């Protein structure tokens, strides 16, 4: 179990995370759609996740979404590193009705994000461009490489939810147990 607290002038965040959980979550960021996505992330990755954020959402959702990504990435890093006895690489495609998004992951200590989802538009009052900000913060603080590739879809909610679910399933697969030690020819990650 990892617990991280982070407080800035813009947000106050607490994250509790157990990667070998059962998918339970307790999420409260003040941003309803974002809470829904984090619940999906926990459920489909199998991790237990608590996220509480008191952010300046009266200004914009940006600080809340970005900072939750930072803290969640740090918590995942603390849970996983040093890397050993995991698969390391994984991918998944989750569909939601007409939408499909593929996520490819490398839990390899080298942060990189390829992001190919639509960035324009709103889901109620949630700006689509915030999805990229969240994943960018998460990926760089977790120190993983992720390719998040839009395959098809027209409903923005479905597209984003497909991305979160695909990320969750790929993460669960990448973190699955492997007996052979450190999954790298370098001998270290």
Swiss-Prot record:
Q: Which PROSITE patterns does this one have?
A: IGP_DEHYDRATASE_1, IGP_DEHYDRATASE_2
Checking InterPro entries in the record gives: IGPD_sf, ImidazoleglycerolP_deHydtase, ImidazoleglycerP_deHydtase_CS, Ribosomal_Su5_D2-typ_SF
Protein's pathway: Amino-acid biosynthesis; L-histidine biosynthesis; L-histidine from 5-phospho-alpha-D-ribose 1-diphosphate: step 6/9
One of the entry's Gene Ontology molecular-function terms is: imidazoleglycerol-phosphate dehydratase activity
EC assignment: 4.2.1.19
Name where it's found. Cytoplasm
Q: Which residues form a coiled coil?
A: none
Q: Name one GO cellular component term.
A: cytoplasm
Give the UniProt keywords, A-Z: Amino-acid biosynthesis, Cytoplasm, Histidine biosynthesis, Lyase
Family membership: Belongs to the imidazoleglycerol-phosphate dehydratase family.
Instruction: List the protein's name.
Output: Imidazoleglycerol-phosphate dehydratase
What species does this protein belong to? Nautilia profundicola (strain ATCC BAA-1463 / DSM 18972 / AmH)
This chain is encoded by the gene named hisB
């Amino acid at each position: 179990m990892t617990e991280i607290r982070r407080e800035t002038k813009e947000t106050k965040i607490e994250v509790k995370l157990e990667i070998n959980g059962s998918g339970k979550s307790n999420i409260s960021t003040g941003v309803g759609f974002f809470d829904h996505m984090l619940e999906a992330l926990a459920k489909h990755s199998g991790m237990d996740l608590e996220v509480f954020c008191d952010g300046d959402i009266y200004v914009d959702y940006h600080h809340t979404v970005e900072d939750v990504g930072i803290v969640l990435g740090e918590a995942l890093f603390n849970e996983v590193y040093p890397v050993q006895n995991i698969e390391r690489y994984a991918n998944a495609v989750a569909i939601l009705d007409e939408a499909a998004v593929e996520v490819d992951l490398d839990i390899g200590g080298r942060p990189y994000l390829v992001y190919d989802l639509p960035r324009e538009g709103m889901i109620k009052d949630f700006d689509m461009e915030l999805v990229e900000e969240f994943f960018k913060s998460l990926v760089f603080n977790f120190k993983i490489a992720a390719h998040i590739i839009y395959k098809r879809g027209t409903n923005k909610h479905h597209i984003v939810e497909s991305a979160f679910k695909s990320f969750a399933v790929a993460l669960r697969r990448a973190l699955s147990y492997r007996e052979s030690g450190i999954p790298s020819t370098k001998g270290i990650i």
